[in-house]
Amino acid sequence: MMAVLLAPSTLAQAGDARNPATDAFDLVEEAPSSVFVDATATHVPTAPSLHSTDSVFVDVNGDGRLDVVVSVEHGVNRLYLNEGAGRLAYMPDAFGTQRRDNEHVRAADFDRDGAMDVVFISESDGEHQLFMGNGKGGFIDASDRLPAGSQGNGLAVGDLNGDGLPDIFIGSTNESTPQADMAAPRSRSLLFFNDAARPGHFIDASGTHLPQREEHTEGVVLADLDDDGDLDVVLASPTHPNRLLLNDGQGRFTDASDRLELTVPMETREVHVADLTGDGHLDIVFFNITSNNAAWDKDPQTRLLVNDGTGHFRDESAQRLPSHTFSSWAGTVVDFDGDGHPDLLVGAIQVPGFVPLQLRAWRNDGTGHFSDATAEVVPGITVGRSWSMGQGDLDGDGGTDVLVGGWGTQARLLLSKGRR
């Protein structure tokens, strides 16, 4: 009997009348993937109820192989060491034993000692964590070097003030719990400059270098969006219009959100930036949900905002992206077919119901027009409540592999077939 997989309906793809309750459940014949092998069963520690919210691929022990650091919501963050060929082994208590509401993770050599360090952000308990790596797979808790807490749910790392050191940008939400640090407004973004006099220690520049307003941020991305040589910021929000902050080169940001053509209300959970149209200018992708697993509310259609070449962004989603009604808490940009054009992997969850669906793959034709290539690219077993994704060459074959996070479903590892 031919196996089947879940896919968007032909009707929804065509953009005709859509039924959010049923569109995601049409069945199509499954063909073997020509791009990825789902190696979860043999390469990833089994944890089907874990809330794997994000991951980064980084060599923590200097053996030349990428390891994986995973943020865990309502749990303890995890370190998976790469034992070779992308097989991951769980190293318990690498980041302590305390359970937190961890949302995202990023890595950088913050103290310039040649070893990679790791920062996690937490939402409901409001306490972020910084761990300094020793280059041998061990970490020391240095969270006291972070100058403030918040209810964090967006995280990015990069040199924001031009001094050559990686800084930290944290987007915050407005949840209220007794444990949260209320010394500062809950939902304002945080900007931590790496102290040039003491690399790996941080100075809070939020009050002097950021617009002072309440926000509700679930996603953050850094990129040079106005082509002036410094990193700007895009903030993704589930309740407010998404925002663009432009950098003056010294880490002072001004609101330039009027450059974003936001044509419909969105509940955005993640944002990515890449040159998707091949014109040399960076474009913006917003991954959206209809609601946080409540009733049908906003249109969850993924949105593509195309750079017009001057740092202004037009919404061209209708003519460039497949139409869909599933909700997407996350996705990633990756050239999965090796043609030199960035493609998209798109997480899919049916809401209402919070039903796990198959990961989607959208192929770029090179001009920023995308077609659904799920049946060809994604193995039929790659199903879950897909959350934020890490990527890199785990098995050393020259292809890009992807770890798909899972909220209460098994995180799944896709190994690329590209250069095997």
Question: Which ranges hold each PLM region?
Answer:
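Acidic carboxylate motifs that coordinate Ca2+ or other divalent cations, activating on Asp/Glu
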Residues: 63, 67, 113, 117, ...
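Bacterial N-terminal signal peptides
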Residues: 1-9
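Hydrophobic beta-strand segments that make up the repeating blades of beta-propeller
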Residues: 68-72, 118-122, 168-172, 233-237, ...
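Beta-strand-rich domains and repeat architectures in extracellular enzymes and scaffolds
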Residues: 43-71
